[in-house]
């Protein structure tokens, strides 16, 4: 019987790619792929035929090819060879454009066309035909008989592994396959399914012994085997995914997150346990096991995985929910197989990263309670304290085992001691049990700094458990011990507790009344320390004052030598006597902020205070502050009659006003302590000095009145010559000062006249105001001149003064009236000029001639036309409505819509490269230019997505 063998020859369906006929004879041999012994197809490197996108120089993973896409099983029975195709992919395997079923095997025949992958393969139905003229990986099944060159070539390359590229028809040989027992099991499974002889030796059967490998049954592939159908097999000994060597990577947060997302997605599809967190968590564990089984992809295989999981976890929480919905879960797990493949690849990548990192040996800390046995390398626990044995530690724990009655008593004593810290009472002695507990707590704190926390933690927990209360968290030193008896030495004397003066130890300026009172006491004590007393103090009535001075560091030794009564007053700061306080020292003290405004006794005193500033006499300009203080103290109107000093404008008066607040405060505080005899003597002495002072003040007031008259005469006489006007300009500054003096003297005169004087001063002020404005230059605004006229109409006296003005004033009035008349003439001329009438609008429907506007310069558009062909561009209709993102090629600067490139309106990052030309173009650019992105967009069954606004 003639032996017939089948093989695959690569055909190029895409017209834009190179054709098979263009190759030489040697290259045509490279387009043949042998099917002897069975083959596996996919994009994973473990397959016999590896599909790659691009060319031999650029290797990229294809988009519509699975890791393990399909298998071809080869059987040989009675000299008849059969080739069966099995589809295990998501995007389908097609024979003569008919989609294969996943659970069936199709027999290959000579002349069939087999295509791997389709852009819409995930949505195609089995046993239905779908045209795919531009398939990247298409092959024609050819037959060869013995004696033909192709027959010998197929026999030569039966064990080789090749790479097939989408851009070229020639396959690249990457070396022979390695034989393995796993492939023999797969071959035996294929033979037994088709009625072939079964192999006796199997890796799963323990009774059979291994036999030498059959040279006529070579290994077929490097993929992981399925569970055998007709041989005994125990699933608990199964080692999926390399015995799960990636078990460390399974605990990665990224891997767990992907599993949780897949479980949540399946729960949403099911709809029954969306909000049941227990079922979702159990489902994530099931999916974790599903990742390990790489080759179990069909529905029946998924049902087997779910059944085994439910059986192993029988009795767990919510397992019955999964077992009742096994059929639905199997269908969803089959649909989620592409996502499962991505999760599996993530697990492999995480494990590869973990293998690169070299693990360091475990190092034990110095305070560890474990030691390493050199022989076995196992950590064994040892005692923390090497000097103490285990028996001593047990005896120590027994020694602190206090009874419940004593522990309650200790708790009460602790509470009493803590309360004693708040209330100032005498310290109470502690019981012996309490002292033992405190001593051991101190020892525990000392051990805490020396030994490991294992020993200290046991110790502290035992103490807290014995005492039946919350452990003490504060410092142990807070709990006081028994009090000591009070003894005093014979040579030492008791000292009274004294309050610290707040003013000396604070930065306050006396903002409250209490601070002000304490301030006065401290000020008086400071005066006592600096000045001292002229006469010995006398006891006052009532006995409230004491002779104890304010203690200082220098007087501390002197203070301890004298005994002080027990019933001494708490505030030891003494009051000051009026006779022992010089007024000059009192006036130099700072004035509190809350002290009242000082007042003057009468109008005469106001004149006496204000006149020294106006008199040229230096003696009267700086009066003696002692005399002023005595005058204010001796007069009876110091308490009753008060007149404000707000109108005192002279500098000397302000300096006197700064002196008076402290004088008024000190005199008010000392007046209560003065005796009647001292007051009488003070009045006699002060009255004599007052008379002398008043005479000097009267003389100075007469001289000031003369100066005021001279100033008025000088201001009233006009300058008739230019020389005199220049002199007047030179004396402007001096006249301003004299006018201020004039106002101050007029205010002082108004105090003597009373109410009638107030009215006259108002008129004088108005008259002065009007004359000053009249002397201003004519370059000022007219509004001020109108105000002057209104002021002239107010009072008759002002009008009379203006009539009697000298010749210079008349000239200015004439100039003012002339300027006003000129302004009126200008206004009338403006009114006489008639404004030009605007042209009337013509009625009718005739359009007005448009004005010629300059055309703006034409600007080039920022973005050009999309580099994708017009028929494949899916973003043109969204350019006006959506804010589309663009990307340009780094070589030719050709612009592309990001939506046309990868169906996502997210800008490229700076570290990402985009190339549409050159030797290494980007995969996304090639897909967009080849129309794959457009085809994928059109193949979407549901509503097409719309580009969303990109977040900048």
From Swiss-Prot:
> Among the record's GO biological process terms, what is one?
regulation of gene expression
Q: Which domain of life is it from?
A: Eukaryota
Give the matching SMART domains: FHA
Q: Where is the composition biased (Low complexity)?
A: 662-679, 715-724
Compositional bias (Polar residues) spans?
Answer: 179-195, 202-220, 569-584, 600-620
Record GO cellular component, one term: nucleus
Report whether Transcription shows up as a keyword of the record: yes
Q: Which CDD domains match?
A: FHA_TCF19
| Main subcellular location of this protein, as a coarse class | nucleus
The UniProt regions of compositional bias labelled Acidic residues, in chain numbering, are 523-537, 789-800
Where in the cell does this protein reside? Nucleus
Family annotation (InterPro entries): FHA_dom, SMAD_FHA_dom_sf, TCF19, Znf_RING/FYVE/PHD
Mind telling me which Pfam families this protein's record contains?
A: FHA
Q: Which UniProt keywords apply?
A: Nucleus, Transcription, Transcription regulation
Q: Where is the composition biased (Basic and acidic residues)?
A: 553-568, 685-706, 725-742, 823-832, 856-866
Q: Does the keyword Transcription apply?
A: yes
Q: Where is this region: Disordered?
A: 174-220, 483-639, 652-866
Q: Where is the composition biased (Basic residues)?
A: 761-772
FHA domain mapped to chain residues: 39-100
Primary role:
Potential transcription factor that may play a role in the regulation of genes involved in cell cycle G1/S transition. May bind to regulatory elements of genes.
UniProt cross-references to PANTHER family, sorted A to Z:
TRANSCRIPTION FACTOR 19
Protein name listed in UniProt: Germ layers disorganized gldi-3
According to its UniProt entry, this protein's organism is Caenorhabditis elegans
Gene for this protein?
Answer: gldi-3
């Amino acid at each position: 019987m003639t032996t017939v063998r089948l093989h695959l020859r690569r055909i190029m369906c895409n017209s834009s790619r190179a054709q098979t006929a263009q190759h030489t004879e040697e290259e045509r041999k490279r387009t043949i792929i042998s099917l002897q012994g069975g083959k596996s197809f996919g994009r994973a490197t473990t397959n016999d035929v590896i599909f790659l996108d691009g060319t031999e120089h650029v290797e990229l993973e294809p988009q519509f090819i699975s890791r393990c896409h399909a298998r071809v099983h080869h059987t040989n029975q009675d000299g008849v060879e059969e080739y069966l195709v099995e589809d295990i992919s998501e995007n389908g395997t097609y024979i003569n454009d008919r989609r294969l079923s996943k659970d069936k095997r199709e027999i290959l025949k000579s002349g069939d066309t087999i295509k791997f992958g389709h852009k819409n393969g995930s949505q195609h139905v089995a046993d239905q035909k779908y045209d795919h003229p531009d398939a990247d990986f298409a092959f024609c099944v050819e037959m060869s008989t013995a004696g033909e060159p192709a027959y010998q070539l197929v026999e030569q390359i039966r064990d080789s592994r090749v790479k097939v590229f989408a851009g070229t028809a020639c396959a690249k040989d990457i070396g022979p396959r390695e034989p393995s027992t796993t492939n023999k099991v797969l071959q035996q499974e294929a033979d037994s399914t088709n009625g072939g002889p079964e192999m006796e030796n199997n890796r799963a059967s323990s009774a059979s012994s291994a036999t030498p490998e059959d040279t006529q049954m070579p290994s077929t592939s490097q993929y992981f085997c399925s569970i055998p159908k007709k041989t005994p097999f125990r699933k608990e000994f199964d080692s999926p995914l390399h015995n799960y060597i990636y078990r460390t990577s399974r605990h990665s947060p990224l891997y767990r997150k992907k599993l949780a997302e897949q479980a949540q997605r399946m729960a949403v599809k099911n709809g029954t346990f969306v909000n049941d967190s227990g079922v979702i968590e159990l489902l994530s564990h099931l999916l974790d096991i599903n990742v390990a089984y790489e080759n179990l992809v069909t529905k029946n295989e998924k049902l087997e995985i779910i059944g085994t999981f439910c059986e192993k976890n029988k009795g767990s929480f919510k397992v019955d929910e999964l077992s009742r919905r096994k059929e639905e879960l199997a269908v969803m797990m089959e649909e989620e197989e592409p996502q499962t493949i991505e999760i599996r690849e993530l697990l492999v990548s995480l494990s590869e990263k973990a293998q690169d990192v070299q693990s360091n040996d475990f190092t034990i800390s110095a305070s560890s309670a474990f030691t390493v046995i050199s022989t076995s390398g196992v950590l064994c626990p040892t005692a923390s304290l090497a000097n103490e044995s285990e028996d001593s530690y047990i005896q120590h724990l027994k020694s602190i085992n206090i009874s419940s009655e004593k522990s309650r008593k200790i708790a009460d004593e602790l509470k009493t001691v803590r309360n004693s810290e708040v209330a100032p009472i005498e310290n109470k002695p502690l019981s012996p049990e309490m002292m033992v507990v405190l001593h051991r707590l101190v020892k525990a704190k000392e051990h805490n700094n020396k030994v490991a926390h294992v020993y200290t933690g046991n110790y502290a927990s035992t103490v807290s458990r014995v005492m039946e209360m919350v452990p003490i968290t504060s410092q142990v030193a807070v709990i006081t011990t028994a009090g000591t008896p009070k003894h005093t030495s014979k040579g030492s004397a008791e000292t009274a507790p004294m309050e610290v003066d707040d003013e000396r130890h604070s930065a306050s300026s006396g903002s409250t009344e209490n601070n002000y009172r304490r301030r006065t006491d401290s000020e008086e004590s400071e005066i006592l320390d600096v000045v001292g007393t002229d006469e010995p103090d006398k006891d006052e009535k009532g006995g409230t004052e004491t002779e104890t001075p304010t203690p200082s560091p220098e007087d501390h030794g002197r203070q301890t030598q004298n005994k002080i009564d027990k019933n001494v007053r708490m505030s030891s700061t003494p009051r000051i006597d009026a006779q022992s306080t010089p007024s000059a020292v009192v006036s130099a003290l700072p004035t509190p902020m809350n002290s009242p405004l000082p007042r003057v006794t009468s109008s005469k005193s106001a004149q006496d205070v204000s006149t020294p500033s106006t008199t040229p006499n230096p003696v009267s300009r700086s009066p003696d502050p002692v005399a002023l203080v005595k005058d204010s103290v001796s007069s009876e109107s110091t308490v009753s009659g008060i007149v404000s000093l707000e109108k005192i404008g002279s500098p000397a008066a302000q300096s006197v006003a700064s002196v008076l607040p402290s004088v008024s405060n000190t005199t008010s505080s000392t007046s209560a302590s003065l005796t009647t005899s001292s007051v009488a003597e003070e009045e006699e002495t002060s009255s004599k000095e007052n008379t002398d002072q008043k005479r000097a003040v009267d003389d100075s007031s007469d001289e000031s009145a003369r100066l005021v008259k001279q100033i008025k005469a000088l201001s009233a006489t006009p300058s008739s010559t230019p020389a005199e006007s220049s002199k007047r300009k030179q004396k402007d500054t001096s006249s301003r000062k004299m006018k201020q003096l004039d106002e101050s003297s007029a205010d002082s005169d108004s105090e003597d006249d009373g109410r009638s004087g107030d009215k006259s001063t108002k008129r004088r002020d108005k008259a002065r105001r009007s004359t000053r404005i009249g002397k201003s230059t004519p370059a000022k605004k007219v509004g001020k001149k109108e105000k002057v006229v209104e002021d002239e109409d107010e009072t008759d006296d002002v009008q009379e003064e203006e009539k009697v003005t000298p010749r210079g004033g008349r000239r200015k009035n004439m100039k003012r009236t002339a300027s006003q008349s000129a302004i009126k003439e200008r206004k009338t001329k403006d009114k006489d000029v008639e404004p030009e009438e605007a042209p009337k609008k013509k009625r009718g429907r005739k359009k007005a001639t448009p004005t010629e506007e300059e055309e703006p310069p034409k600007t080039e558009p920022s973005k050009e036309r999309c580099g994708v062909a017009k028929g494949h561009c899916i973003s043109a209709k969204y350019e006006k409505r959506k804010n589309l993102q663009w990307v340009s090629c780094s070589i030719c600067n050709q612009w592309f819509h990001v939506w046309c490139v990868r169906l996502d309106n997210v800008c490229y990052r700076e570290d990402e490269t985009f190339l549409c030309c050159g030797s290494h173009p980007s995969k996304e650019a090639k897909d967009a230019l080849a129309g794959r992105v457009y085809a994928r967009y059109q193949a979407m069954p549901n509503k097409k997505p719309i580009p969303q606004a990109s977040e900048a």
